[in-house]
Structures are given as C-alpha cells and as structure tokens.
C-alpha cells in the first residue's frame, strides 16, 4: 500500500534538487503534488516527470519572502484540490562565506528573509488551512547548520537554528489540533548547487563524514516520506539528522 495515497502535498523549492526528489518520491507514494517555486523556474519538465508516475500535479509560482505570494500559492493549492494535507517547506538560499564583522547588512537580511521568515510565512498559511480542515503535517527543511555552527555562514546558521525553534513551537502549540511538525537536518547533499563549490571544498566535506561520501537527494526524500506519512504518527517537534555520522 502506498504511504501517501491521495494526499495533497505542497513543496516549496520543489522544481530542483532535494525538493524535486521529494516531489518524485511523494508522487510514487500516491500523492498529488504541488510544486511551488519561483515563477522563472522551468517547471514543465518536472511536471511531466511527476505525471508519468500518476496522480494530479500543479505548479504555482511563489516567492517565499513575500507573504502575499505565499498566501496566494496556498490558496491556489486549496482551490485546485480542496485541501492541503502535507507541506514541505524546503525553499532556501545559501550565501557567501563571510566574517560577521564585515558582513553587509543586506546579505544578512536577505538570508534571514528567505530561510527563516519565508518558512514562517509558509507555516502561517499552511496552519490556517490545517485548522479549517482538522489537521495536517508540516516538514521543515533545516540543516545540520541548525544544530552546529557553520564557519563563515552566520546568517544561514542563525536561520536554520530558527527553523528548528519554529518547528518545535508548531508542535507545542498545535498538537491538539492534529497538526504534526518535524524538521530534517541534512549535511551536504549531492545537488547541482553543491557542484558549484570548488573541488577541494567538496573533498573536505566528504572527508568530514565517517561514511566518506555526501548524501543523495533520494535519501533525503525517503526521510521526508517517513515524516510525512503515518509511519511517524507519534513523531512531533523533532529533528531527523541525515549527516553520515558527522555529529558523532
């Protein structure tokens, strides 16, 4: 039996990388998937891949840093499918490596706006729908940087710590309303973005893991399915770490 049969799954940043892997895995598990991504994203190829696996799917444009855009994307999802069962708040950006003392204010603010405030905007409108319909599941994509400092990435680290705090607050405040919220904390995952890093840097990331490799998007997607499905029905307010043993 498929784990997400007929569930409506809303995924921000779902057109590439980890988000796309999660969308494909959710579709394979029987879900109807909404890809929420930048309007500039070339989403037709992704929708074709999803359709080949079955179900109904939708692309909605979103800028997670804009509350009106987030509200409209969630509304479009509900208008099409009549409900929202599962939300994966995955959209985010990296940032330049920088000291704190010489970091431009605009760089700090942009990363916080997208990686933390953007998650808040999504959670807010997802919760409004969940409360109307009697429950739902939220999975927030955090990072290992939400659990430990990442040298040179202060705003990213601060934002991901904030995402974990927000996730726990959702769990505490809305558990009685049949809302579950959990987070995934991956280490570096093999995505096109990762391959933009210099080879020496990538090798240093690999050397830091006891497994001597980086994670794969499909491995994150499997974790998402676990947290999204009834397999994790008593899991609430926790973090699932995918790091190959880095935190040991």
Where are these regions (language model features)?
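Conserved glycine-rich cofactor-binding loop
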Residues: 15-16
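Short, small/polar-rich loop/turn modules that mediate ligand/substrate recognition or access, typified
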Residues: 175, 180, 235-237
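C-terminal substrate-recognition "lid" of short-chain dehydrogenase/reductases
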Residues: 11, 135, 213-242, 247
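Active-site helix of classical SDR
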Residues: 123, 159, 167
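Residue(s) in the substrate-gating loop at a strand-loop-helix junction
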Residues: 143
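Substrate-binding pocket helix/loop in short-chain dehydrogenase/reductase
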Residues: 98-100, 104-112, 194, 205
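The beta1-alpha1 cofactor-binding region of Rossmann-like NAD(H)/NADP(H)-dependent oxidoreductases
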Residues: 40-41, 61-72, 105, 218-219
């Amino acid at each position: 039996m498929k784990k997400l049969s007929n569930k409506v799954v809303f995924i921000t940043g779902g057109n590439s990388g980890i988000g796309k892997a999660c969308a494909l895995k959710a579709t394979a598990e029987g879900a109807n998937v909404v890809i929420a991504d930048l309007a500039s994203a070339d989403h037709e190829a992704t929708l074709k891949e999803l359709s080949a696996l079955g179900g109904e799917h939708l692309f909605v444009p979103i800028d997670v840093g804009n509350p009106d855009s987030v509200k409209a994307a969630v509304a479009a999802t509900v208008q099409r499918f009549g409900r929202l069962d599962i939300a994966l708040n995955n959209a985010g950006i990296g940032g330049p490596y920088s000291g704190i003392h010489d970091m431009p204010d605009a760089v700090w603010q942009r990363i916080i706006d997208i990686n933390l405030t953007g998650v808040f905007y999504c959670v807010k409108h997802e919760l409004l729908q969940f409360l109307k319909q009697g429950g739902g599941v939220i999975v927030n994509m955090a990072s290992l940087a939400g659990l430990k400092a990442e040298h040179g990435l202060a705003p990213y680290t601060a934002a991901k710590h904030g995402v974990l705090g927000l996730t726990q607050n959702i769990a505490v405040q809305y558990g009685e309303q049949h809302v579950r919220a959990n987070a995934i904390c991956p280490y570096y995952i093999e995505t096109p973005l990762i391959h933009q890093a210099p080879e020496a840097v990538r090798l240093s990331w690999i050397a830091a893991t006891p497994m001597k490799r980086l994670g794969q998007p499909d491995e994150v997607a499997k974790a998402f399915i676990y947290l999204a499905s009834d397999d994790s029905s008593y899991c609430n307010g926790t973090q699932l770490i995918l790091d190959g043993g880095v935190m040991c």
